[in-house]
Amino acid sequence: MEQEICAISFSGGQDSTTLAVWAKKRFKKVYLVGFDYAQKHSVELECAQKIASLLQLPYEIIPLDFLENITHSALFKNSNDLMGHSHAQNKDLPNSFVPNRNAIFITLLHSYAQKIGASNIALGVSQADFSGYPDCKEDFIKSIEHALNLGSNTAIKILTPLMFLNKAQEFQMAKDLGVLDLVIKETHTCYQGERKILHAYGYGCGECPACQLRKKGYEEFESNKK
């Protein structure tokens, strides 16, 4: 395994784009991997491709559209569920949650890391300022890292440098990395796939949970500068 290689789960959003720039400054080679799981906001894949080109990093998409056939989420293209309600399978979770999505992403990324000889994979997950998804928490990440390494006789590290950063701190991190303008104008967060309306914090409908979280973070980021 090469310490200089890192594989990243890359959606083209604020978190994973900031993460990609962070990794590019620390590793000799960085590979970006996106996942097409029949999400409503599939425009994020187009944004991811453009950002990967701007960062001059290799990027490939793994198709996972079968997920729509085996579980529920308001994020799926064919779902008529309105955002902001409880999940059909678990009332304690938001209906934007895709059951086991991160477990699947991480497992595939772990396999990909073995293929390219990477000893690190990186995720843009955070438990400090998140949408209520249990698979974004540190205890889950540590558990799946342990399980996957046991099951493959490897010692691949899962890096989560954003784990304890809120959205305001992520905007500050992007600024410190010199990519704040890129994050605002090129990344995509909106669950509705809105790319026509540019707000101070970026493109989006301004109403969905993802937009609200990003807006709140940007306003706090701006407030901290005063």
Curated annotation (Swiss-Prot):
Keyword list, A-Z: ATP-binding, Ligase, Metal-binding, Nucleotide-binding, Queuosine biosynthesis, Zinc
HAMAP family (alphabetical): QueC
Protein name: 7-cyano-7-deazaguanine synthase
Entry binding sites for Zn(2+): 190, 205, 208, 211
InterPro entries the UniProt entry points to: QueC, Rossmann-like_a/b/a_fold
Gene Ontology molecular function terms on file: ATP binding; ligase activity, forming carbon-nitrogen bonds; zinc ion binding
CC cofactor: Zn(2+)
Pfam family name, one: QueC
Entry EC no(s): 6.3.4.20
Reaction catalyzed: 7-carboxy-7-deazaguanine + NH4(+) + ATP = 7-cyano-7-deazaguanine + ADP + phosphate + H2O + H(+)
Pathway this chain belongs to: Purine metabolism; 7-cyano-7-deazaguanine biosynthesis
Gene Ontology BP, a term: queuosine biosynthetic process
Gene name tied to this protein: queC
Broad EC category: ligase
SUPFAM superfamilies: Adenine nucleotide alpha hydrolases-like
Gene3D superfamilies in the cross-refs: HUPs
Residues the record lists as binding ATP: 10-20
UniProt family annotation: Belongs to the QueC family.
Function as written in the Swiss-Prot or TrEMBL entry: Catalyzes the ATP-dependent conversion of 7-carboxy-7-deazaguanine (CDG) to 7-cyano-7-deazaguanine (preQ(0)).
Top-level taxon of the source organism: Bacteria
